[in-house]
């Protein structure tokens, strides 16, 4: 039985900030990274919140995430830009990209900025809401490692590839943020930590059969051994699996 302990936002903010400072990020960088993570937790998206700390730390130790990476704008027009991320922290690159997009949109009416050679950037919706707070329509999408098993497939071929949209509206802003898979890898990590079986219809084992074994699915994803997470819509075109597969493409 999982045991839960409650901590205040202030406690978690300090803990995460101290951790990322230990990782080598400066104060301003820590503020951005931690805000993205804790915003996710406040929204109830625990899969993309501070539970990612361990995975980020491992990424830094392995050199997959470059703490001192300096992003470079390698292409730019009045309405668009491409940023070379140099394998930096995803949250910092996502924040920089949306900041540039907002600036361009305010001048030209539209701003489109893409990032290459980045890392996991947290919830896509955070960046869409950055634009919404400025009175603009914001969109944010990203690819990821292969975790989605295409309709009728056995092996993960596509990422969770989320789509997020935020726009000003009355009485409340419109906000949508969803992966194109049934769930994300992060959700499987949460179930694994809680030692809970996965609900039916979430994942496939390496033989293409439905499974509730979170540790096994995660291990297969890492090893690229087959299996993975189902597309939005599940396993069959009858339930709309082809739609999640198509959105992911």
Can you annotate each of these PLM segments?
Residues 225-249:
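Internal helical hairpin/lid segments
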Residues 148-222:
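Phosphate/diphosphate-binding glycine-rich loops and adjacent basic-rich segments that engage nucleotide
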Residues 21-24, 39-46:
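N-terminal and secondary-structure boundary signal
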Residues 27-38:
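Short, well-structured alpha-helical segments
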Residues 82-170:
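A generic, well-ordered mixed alpha/beta core segment in the N-terminal half of proteins
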